[in-house]
Amino acid sequence: MDWNELEKIRLAKVEAMRSEDIEPYPTRSEVDQTIKTAIIAFEDFEKQSEPSINAPQAILAGRIRSKRVMGKLAFCHIEDSSGRLQLMLRVNEIGQGGLKEFDERFDLGDFIQAGGSLMRSRTGEITLLVSEYKMLAKAITPLPAAKDEIVDGKVVHHATLSDPETRYRQRYADLAVNDEARNIFRTRTAIIRALQRFLDKHDFIEVETPILQPIYGGAAARPFSTFHNQLHQELFLRISFELYLKRLLVGGFDRVYEIGRDFRNEGVSFKHNPEFTQLEFYMAYADYEKIMGLTEQMLATVCDEVLGKRTFIFDGQEINMDIPWRRVELRQGILEATGVDIYAYPDAEALYQAMQKAGLNPKEGQPRGKLIDSLIGDFLEPNCIQPTFLYDYPRDISPLAKNKPGNPQIVERFEGFVGGMELCNAFTELNDPLEQEKRFAEMGRTYDADDEENHPMDEDYLQAMSFGMPPSGGFGMGIDRLTMLLTGNRSIREVILFPYLRDIESEE
């Protein structure tokens, strides 16, 4: 590695410590509790009517986040994943040599172990009065930037990082210095756990299905492909869990769900990442109406558990997740927004001409399904700020959904929108193997062989359906987008620990 001048200074400290047989990266620590636990123990000690003579003792560890040395006294703040605490180092306890060593060898970003007794400083801050300490890990590279803060009349230097590109590329540094970033991912974890609790409570079982698949399906997207050398077989990273989860319905599991990664070889945007986390569940003997109700309950419960309320601010607007959500029939919604009645134009060319006449600037040469998708994305989705279900979709764009009784051109499908973006997608599942085979064939004829919307024929899935699949409802939702909403972030990169980024060399 090429080291800059500041890093060379820290490397010299590493060499100096080792020359004195002091290991800057020891194998073990003697930590006996977290910072949060120590603070709680001290607060309990203070509440005692007749406190014991000796204050609580603790051996703590953390990253040094601030540091100041003043004559025979030094202060620093350390931080672990549970909280932050001030350390006080005095000549009385550690000697002049100990204070000198701390001053000269410890820098912001270093991990320190400190033992001593808990107390309150003159300003009332809970503090560990250090009687012994040691280096746990020397940080050679300084934390990315610095800001100053006045504490007790003294200037304290704190590490921070704000440049978005650097934060995404060096997420480890971002997490090390930004509380806000860590809180986003704590919230993300809380969201996933709340979803699991809700589904478990409703008798769903969590399962795992293949990530490497011989045939991709369950969504309209271009897959990533790979090759198994020993089997001489092309494989695909899954774009959806759907077809495998529905095989489990055939096998007798009436309520199943999976939370995991999907991979789609498509564009990157503020709300799209090629690798993303998805929740899908399937429920036997349910239809899309029942799934709508379950969706409302589930997301209201998640808000209650994660936020403690059902309202939050997203993109400057207050969103209210109370039940029930607004419901808009898709045909009527498009008609009111654009003046185009999509069911009056049963083929792509007729719909294209109608959109042209209405001044909607459609893209030429698109299948009818893609034209309808563009109407939804351009004219309905941005206006669905409060939770909204768009329902009853054309069969053209829903090859796995069941027809609405009495209308073979419409399927029982809904999409949920919140904050002006799609959050979830669900439908009454098609369980007729003959109709499903016909739909797969139609998709193959409608789109070119290399089109991303082309849905390959999955013979094994059809075989599974032929054994009998119960009537059911299915649901899919992006965990990343839900996290965006509940943390108030407009960019998906903010809620994925290591988002996809273009190589720096290719940018140059």
Residue ranges and their predicted role:
Residues 1-508:
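Class II aminoacyl-tRNA synthetase catalytic cores and aaRS-like
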